[in-house]
Every structure is written in structure tokens, then in C-alpha cells.
Amino acid sequence: MMNQMGMHMQQPGVVPGGPGGPVGMAGGPVGGVGVSPVMMQSPQMQQQQQVAAQQQQQQQQQQQAQAHQQQSQQTEKVDNISKVKGLVGPLRDSLSTTVKTAAQLLQQNNLNDAGTKGGDMSTTTPRFDKHLEEFYSICDQIELNLKTAKLCMQQGASSQQYLPIPVAPTQPNPAETNALSYSQYLDVVKIQIGYAKDIHDTLICAAQNICPSE
């Protein structure tokens, strides 16, 4: 009996543990298999990794959206009206330079006619014709862009009048089911051109029949 009681007595500083064996005072398993704290934290680590991956995907999507917006803005700036707006500044500078050059040449010619020296002869005479040609070149570019914009507006109005069905771009939106594709639009234009040619030929034949040539 004394031996059995001694076997059941607890050792000092040791408390009985579970299936893994006795547990010490610090709470760690003694002589048994415990659960690693890394394994206990693995679900939290997985959640953090998933959140980080989602944030990276969102950042990539935002960057792609910003790049798409920049490309669309660059393509929008290519139209004729934007070109005209961009040429207004160079036109103003060219006009100012041309007027200043003309004033310098007039002053120099006045001094030459009066028989006085026009300052330092080593300085080069400003080229009035060059500045004037540059000014007219910018004016021609503005005029050409304005004419092109006017023709585009006229063609757009004619298209809305004679072909009210909207034309889809090269990459059509799936939601726009009542839109023509670009290839269908080209076919319609070819048919209209053929009709116009037939009417033209018919009118010419009728005019020749009314007034036959001798």
C-alpha cells in the first residue's frame, strides 16, 4: 500500500498532463508531443497572405485603369480642335516675333536713309521673311484643322440623317445589341455608293436620249 501511494504522489513542480505527458510549471509539455505555436498561427498567416494578394490585385487594377485613362486622354488630344488650341500659343509668339522684327528693320532702314550708322554692324540683321513665313505656316495649319473639323461635323450630320443606326467601334460593347459593326457599316456605305452611281448613270442616259448628239 505504501508503494502504491508513493507511485501516485506527484513530483514537486510537476502537474499531471494530458495524453501528451506531464506538464511543467512553465506550461510546456514534458516528455509528450505538443502543438507548435507556428501551426497555431498558420490560419492567421494565410488570411494575411490572402489580404495582401487582394490588395496587390486591386493596385494592379487601379494602375491598369489609370493607364487606360491616360491613353484615352492622349487619343482625345489628337482631334483637330485640340490641335488648333495647341497652335494658338505658337501663333501668338510668332506674331509677336514678326512684329518686333518688322519694327527693328524699319528702324534700321530709317537710320540708313538718314545717313547715320545703325549701331553695331557686326550684329546680324533679323530675317523678317523667315518669321513671316513661319507665321503664315501656323495660320495654314490652323485653317486646315478648322476645315477638317467642319467637314467631320458635316459628315457626322449627314450620317445621322441618312444612317440613324449607331455604328459600333472596332471593339463593340456587348450591351449595344442594336448597333452595326464596322464591317456592316462599310457594306452599307458601298451599297449607297452603288445606288448613287446607278442614279448618275440613269440620269446621263436620260439626258443623252432627250438631246441626242448629231
From Swiss-Prot:
The entry's cellular-component GO terms read: mediator complex
The UniProt entry, under InterPro entries, shows: Mediator_Med29_met
Q: Name one Pfam family in it.
A: Med29
Bias-annotated ranges (Low complexity): 44-74
Q: Name one GO molecular function term.
A: transcription coregulator activity
Q: Where is the composition biased (Gly residues)?
A: 15-34
Top-level taxon in the UniProt lineage: Eukaryota
Localization per record: Nucleus
Q: Spell out the family assignment given in the record's similarity comment.
A: Belongs to the Mediator complex subunit 29 family.
- UniProt name for this protein: Mediator of RNA polymerase II transcription subunit 29
